[in-house]
Amino acid sequence: MVFGPGLLSVQFMNIISTTGKQRARQLLFIMGALLIATHEVCPSLAEERREKIGLVLAGGGALGMAHVGVLKVLEENRVPIAYVAGTSMGSIIGAAFATGQRVDAMEQLLIESNWDEIFSDSVNRDELSYRSKAGRNREIYGDTKISVKNGKLITPFGVVQGQRLLPVLQRLYENGPPSPADFNEFRIPLRVVAADIETGQAVVVSKGDVATAVRASMSVPGVFAPVEIDGRLLVDGGITNNLPMDVVREMGADRLIVVELNADLQKRDSLSSPLAIGGQIISILLAQNSAIQKKTLTKEDILIEPNLTGYTAVDFGKAKELIALGEEAARRLIPQLKHLSVSEAEYAKFKAAREATIKQTTVEFVTIHCDKHGSKEFLDKVVTTKPGDILDRNALDEEVERIYNTGDY
């Protein structure tokens, strides 16, 4: 039985004209009817009124591994996240969370990965042809100019192209929808922040291939080659908006959980590689623009700042320690986080939906583009993946690695 507002008003008017036990009985009846009406008309009222919590993950190179520790604490305390935005390393972790990667799987990947190899474009010289070896020698001993050829940016030796990084990112996001995708359709809506190297403007990526978007967001100028998306040449978003609080608010968040990363600057004797110098530049720039964003914090927002003293943006080999520091910082704020907790049943539903395994992906087509330096016959032989096959990412990665190691592609 459902009582509308008009009927309830009539019943209350009738109470005025009654007395004694009759009034009491009628009042109890109307109160019960009101409870039934509320339950039947608005069965999910509590859920609808729940605040939408946005998660903001700052950039900071290796320091961003601390984000995983924060995610562990958010899960333990049943804090449902409605929106995610990240910059640079924050976008790597944020995209993994938004596309359904398990937090423990993220932790394992970060700890077990060989980051020196991932950040290297070196190839196995034993597999190079004589011509490719000669070309590699010319790259090493000369030709350090930046130029444009056939409309593409040609970068000098020493700039990481990210050949080995992209497969790692794709594996992190394999539980998400096929690319290209609308990032609003992810398990948790996502935004990836990069910067346009030509204009200096922040670029918020909300669609396309998520691995490519993240690869752009972490392209430290002078270290990683820029990434072209929609005609714009994109680099690390940390130079324009390292703490994208404004982006998450625009997505619809009522309150924010903000994870800031404060990096120690390195001394001169430690600045001995392009990666170290690039990390130093980003650390300086991100500190400046993060301060601007933090001025917009409200009393409803929660700011988590891991104590990262002694660690730098290039400490990728210290994943375990950095994750622990993020976890420690979040645990200090559990009293505040508890206010955002939902019931065990509700969080279990949220977690199950976020981590739901996607169906197997079927290959629809395979297209191979070969320039004048490559061999179409060789590529046809190496690439065994065919239309109609169930995608085997391990096999595909091996095929790509073999092709890359020839030095011709």
Predicted regions and their residues:
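Bacterial N-terminal signal peptides that target proteins for export
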Residues: 8-28
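C-terminal segment of classical bacterial N-terminal signal peptides
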Residues: 35-43
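Patatin-like phospholipase
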Residues: 42-87, 95-407
